[in-house]
Amino acid sequence: MLDLEMNSLMIIRKSEYKRATWKNGLGFTDEIAIYPEGASLAKGDFQWRLSSARIESASPFSMFPAHDRVLVILRGNGIRMAHRYEEGDPEEINEVGPLEPYEFPGDIQSRCELMKGAITDFSVFSETGRIGAQVAVQELSPDEDFIWNSEGRWNFAFAIDRSIDTDAGNLPEGDTLSCGPGEVRLTAGGHGAKLLLVSLEALG
């Protein structure tokens, strides 16, 4: 079992992700990590959550009144996000391209339209006013040794397109490295690699 209290260096394998139904029941999500232990997507009682999902058609997004969201398109050509902040307001439309972290509040009406086919996304949920989230895409050059100064209480490195070597061992594409604060060595192979780096911190 993943122990997120210990902040130890470990790899979460794709085979360990938990399949769950979207809150609105219109699709599925692969849950990578959730905190605290025992929290669930259905109850919405989590402080933070990491997940990935495939979106194959235009879809409304589930509402999460107590959470902020960051979405990153891992595969696919992009989406149009539409938000309505208040009933009766016109929608705000934003185009989101691949590997562009996109932040939006979870307590508003949101939907997406696919620009050119299905996408796979990565989502970070953080409890509003309680958890701060930093999300960035890091591209490693071929054979590069990258030292990640992971500053959050909880930190994760997701291998987007290729496997990399880490202080915890090999991190295959689609797997996630979990660690506490400190320096972590991430080494790309001869073809380079792209990583998604997530740091989460308790506020106040």
Regions found by a protein language model. Name each.
Residues 1-204:
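Jelly-roll (double-stranded beta-helix
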